[in-house]
Amino acid sequence: MICSHRNSKTISKLQWIKKIKCPYVILNGNPDQEEEFIYDEETHVVTLKCPDDYIGLPHKIKSGFRFVKNRFDPDFVFKIDDDMFVDLDKLFETLKSLDSDYAGTICYKNRVLYFAGPLYYVSHKSINILQDMDVSYSDAEDISVGNCLKYTIRKHFPFYTDDISEGSTAIAYHDHKRQFL
């Protein structure tokens, strides 16, 4: 599940997306559309009836998990931002060691333990819980997810780096400064 924005130009630049061999979606939001979602199977883009800005991210992610659950009912989901470069072989190799319901790069804020938003993993059990997430808890999507999943089995797993020099050894590189996009 790749979180993007309907005006984003980054998706076309992410070559790793073309190598995905399992069902995936690219999430966009449009609060003005009538339908709860519009899904284009060819492009994998699902446009959800929700805000498409930073403050609306908790609602967008909740709606995204609901769509993915109803459409695909997957065993797990990796939530990935559109400013990530991902080594898919390494990412899927981690599944062998992820014996948890929620995993990612650990953060702590406002008394909430959560995994940073650019890339995290949730199990089937967690997907079911996230469909009913309280979106009013925080404007930050990753904090809202962490609060919602506070009673699940968690595992710190450093999926990504923000340091380009570690990019060849890491599972993913977070281009948060948009140097390469």
Tell what function each PLM region has.
Residues 12-24:
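Short, acidic, metal-binding catalytic loop of nucleotide-sugar glycosyltransferases
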Residues 25-75, 85-89:
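Active-site-proximal specificity loops/subdomain of glycosyltransferases
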Residues 1-11:
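N-proximal low-complexity "stem/linker" segments adjacent to membrane-targeting elements
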Residues 124, 136-181:
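C-terminal catalytic/acceptor-binding lobe
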Residues 86-111:
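Conserved donor-nucleotide/metal-binding helix-loop-beta segment in metal-dependent transferases, i.e.
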Residues 107-121, 135-138:
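A recurrent flexible, glycine/aromatic-enriched loop bordering the glycosyltransferase active site
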Residues 87-89, 115-132:
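Conserved nucleotide-sugar donor-binding
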